Amino acid sequence: MKFLFLILSCLGAAVAFPGGADDDKIVGGYTCPEHSVPYQVSLNSGYHFCGGSLINSQWVLSAAHCYKSRIQVRLGEYNIDVQEDSEVVRSSSVIIRHPKYSSITLNNDIMLIKLASAVEYSADIQPIALPSSCAKAGTECLISGWGNTLSNGYNYPELLQCLNAPILSDQECQEAYPGDITSNMICVGFLEGGKDSCQGDSGGPVVCNGELQGIVSWGIGCALKGYPGVYTKVCNYVDWIQETIAAY
């Protein structure tokens, strides 16, 4: 059974929703070099609860299971516990979940957030490119977030965490989660365990060769042997993203 966990407070309290998955953090990774992931954003509702990716000056891409009716988006962040000179805050003006998102299966776990006003790009705030094609199995990717860093217990970091991990084959993904993987999902990580995203990373980016190929979605536990992280396959949604942005 999958369980989905959303952070409720800075202390790491979480609530489980039936249907599926563990909303993901970084376990077994490393502290990212300062401001080396300028497309990473923090979604806030009085506290950090999910990640996201800046895809142009006024739009952020995240996971549909991170939905709230009002979201504050923080850009240019590195240490989420302090106010930084690089930090820019925007309210959401429109929040759009994929119309076929399922909270039970987590299929189509993707969401667009329009910022109330555009942001100016800087060394600390830059968009990430959408995929020009789907990445192949074996491609090395960068996962980032402020999620839990322990597979047992809680430790939410101040500084942005990074993890380098490969895309697994469709067969490996299906065998890890029989009957749960749709064509809109990819597995990224290590079957031997020890390295993974986890609670608090949900909605955040998986970037491969400079393109946003995945969104942190779900998994069983964090960094457990045989259970890699599962991510929304962004290359399947480029048309929907572009059409939705054009409509608003």
Curated annotation (Swiss-Prot):
Q: Which organism is it from?
A: Gallus gallus
RNA-binding in keyword set: no
Details of cofactor binding: Binds 1 Ca(2+) ion per subunit.
This chain's protein is named Trypsin II-P29
Q: According to its UniProt record, where is this protein mainly located?
A: secreted
- Regions that span the bilayer: none
Q: Which GO terms describe its molecular function?
A: metal ion binding; serine-type endopeptidase activity
Tissue specificity here reads: High levels are seen in the pancreas while lower levels are found in the liver, spleen and thymus.
Protein's cellular compartments: Secreted, Extracellular space
Annotated Gene Ontology cellular component terms: extracellular space
Cofactor names: Ca(2+)
Per the record, the similarity remark reads: Belongs to the peptidase S1 family.
- Tell me which residues make up the Peptidase S1 domain: 26-246
Protein keywords: Calcium, Digestion, Disulfide bond, Hydrolase, Metal-binding, Protease, Secreted, Serine protease, Signal, Zymogen
Instruction: Give the active-site positions.
Output: H65 (charge relay system), D109 (charge relay system), S202 (charge relay system)
- Please give the residues making up the propeptide in this record: 17-25
EC code(s) of this entry: 3.4.21.4
Q: Please give the positions of the paired cysteines in each disulfide bond.
A: C32-C162, C50-C66, C134-C235, C141-C208, C173-C187, C198-C222
Q: Please tell me where Ca(2+) binds in this chain.
A: E77, N79, V82, E87
Q: Mind listing the GO biological process terms from this record?
A: digestion; proteolysis
